[in-house]
């Protein structure tokens, strides 16, 4: 049974957010890539090209794009089992992510990780993690080494920022509280991004937490806790920009609670029978991609033809990614134990 509860999203005046045409189109293209990549994953999964659990990100694109597109190449991102789109936003090539989902040697994890373990050292993408909260200590460690390099090893340059993504269900786990405490104690350059999509598999968020407003939990540890409309990429970017600047300047962590919603079931094996039709329709009406498209067209920032060209480019990219994945070799069975240890 679904327990729908109307979620009031924080209001943001997008017209007060001044971004260049180029930056806006980068955001639009990144969200389109994420959405269409996940749709292609669903097609390939049901055709038997992918195996195991596959968790899709449809509906939550504004969070990934709004945060990650503010980061530099040297910054870090740590994800969850719903990790494909985070990797794409960080710059991991779509063909290598697709090949990983196919279990091929050309995948970003050499075909050993699959859907829940996307990883790319060249892009400082620290990976997806199959169990909730696993990534938070890893992300905290990445932020700690950034401080250590600057303060102890006296390496020049700016602090590297870490963005750590996790869901609402994770915030009842011990690692969440422990790492918030450490991050504040050591003023770590980390942004904790809670993608509150209202459901932890089949558990409605408001039924699982004594304080449903996750951002309020930051107060106990002495760091800023900010709630944002996770269906609005410009609102997310505005909040994340301040968090990145704060981290980069050595002022410590920020907790961002992005109110969002997944348009598909928990995984492709989930029939999605627990959520009501009314609840899903209300959130789908807030589609972040359609919202940004309307903003661009209403303000005459770009034409429909330009946006259609972006859509076509994304479609071609994904078709090529599937062709690449299908034509790539399987891992050699003789190398089954390779990559288990650092010397490999």
UniProtKB/Swiss-Prot annotation:
Cofactor(s) needed by this chain: thiamine diphosphate; Mg(2+)
Main location per the UniProt record: plastid
Record-listed Mg(2+) binding positions: 168, 197
Pfam families: E1_dh
Binding sites annotated in the UniProt record for thiamine diphosphate: 81-82, 130, 132, 168-169, 197, 266
Protein residues bound to pyruvate: 55, 81-82, 130, 132, 168-169, 197
E.C. designation(s): 1.2.4.1
Cellular localization per UniProt: Plastid, Chloroplast
Top-level EC class: oxidoreductase
Reaction(s) catalysed (UniProt annotation): N(6)-[(R)-lipoyl]-L-lysyl-[protein] + pyruvate + H(+) = N(6)-[(R)-S(8)-acetyldihydrolipoyl]-L-lysyl-[protein] + CO2
GO cellular component, one term: chloroplast
Keywords: Chloroplast, Magnesium, Metal-binding, Oxidoreductase, Plastid, Pyruvate, Thiamine pyrophosphate
Molecular-function GO terms, alphabetical: metal ion binding; pyruvate dehydrogenase (acetyl-transferring) activity
GO biological process, one term: pyruvate decarboxylation to acetyl-CoA
PANTHER family: PYRUVATE DEHYDROGENASE E1 COMPONENT SUBUNIT ALPHA (PTHR11516:SF60), PYRUVATE DEHYDROGENASE E1 COMPONENT, ALPHA SUBUNIT BACTERIAL AND ORGANELLAR (PTHR11516)
Protein task: The pyruvate dehydrogenase complex catalyzes the overall conversion of pyruvate to acetyl-CoA and CO(2). It contains multiple copies of three enzymatic components: pyruvate dehydrogenase (E1), dihydrolipoamide acetyltransferase (E2) and lipoamide dehydrogenase (E3).
Subunit structure: Heterodimer of an alpha and a beta chain.
Name of the protein in its database record: Pyruvate dehydrogenase E1 component subunit alpha
Gene coding for it: pdhA
């Amino acid at each position: 049974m679904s327990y729908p509860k109307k979620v009031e999203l924080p209001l943001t005046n997008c017209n007060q957010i001044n971004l260049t045409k180029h930056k806006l189109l980068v955001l639009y293209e990144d969200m389109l890539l994420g959405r269409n990549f996940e749709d292609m994953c669903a097609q390939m999964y049901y055709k038997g090209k992918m195996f195991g659990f596959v968790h899709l990100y449809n509906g939550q694109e504004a969070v990934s794009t709004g945060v990650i597109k503010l980061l530099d190449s040297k910054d870090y991102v740590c994800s969850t089992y719903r990790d494909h789109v985070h990797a794409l936003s960080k710059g991991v090539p779509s063909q290598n992510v697709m090949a990983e989902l196919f279990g091929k040697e050309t995948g970003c994890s050499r075909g050993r990780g699959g859907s829940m373990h996307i990883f790319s050292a060249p892009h400082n993408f620290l990976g997806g993690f199959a169990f909730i909260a696993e990534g938070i200590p890893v992300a905290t460690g990445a932020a700690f080494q950034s401080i250590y390099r600057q303060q102890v090893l006296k390496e020049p340059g700016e602090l590297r920022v870490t963005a750590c993504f996790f869901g609402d269900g994770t915030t009842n786990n011990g690692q969440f509280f422990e790492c918030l405490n450490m991050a504040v104690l050591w003023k770590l350059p980390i942004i904790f991004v809670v993608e509150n999509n209202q459901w932890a598999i089949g558990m409605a968020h408001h039924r699982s937490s004594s304080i449903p407003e996750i951002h309020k939990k930051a107060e106990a540890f002495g760091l800023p806790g900010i709630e944002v409309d996770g269906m609005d990429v410009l609102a997310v970017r505005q909040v994340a920009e301040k968090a990145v600047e704060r981290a980069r300047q050595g002022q410590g962590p920020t907790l961002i609670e992005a109110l969002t919603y997944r348009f598909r079931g928990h995984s492709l094996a989930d029939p999605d029978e627990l959520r009501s039709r009314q609840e899903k329709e209300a959130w789908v009406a807030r589609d972040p991609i359609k919202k940004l498209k309307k903003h661009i067209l209403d303000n005459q920032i770009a034409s429909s033809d330009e946006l259609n060209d972006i859509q076509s480019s994304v479609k071609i990219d994904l078709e090529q990614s599937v062709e690449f994945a299908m034509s790539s070799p399987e891992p050699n069975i003789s190398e089954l134990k390779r990559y288990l240890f650092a010397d490999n």
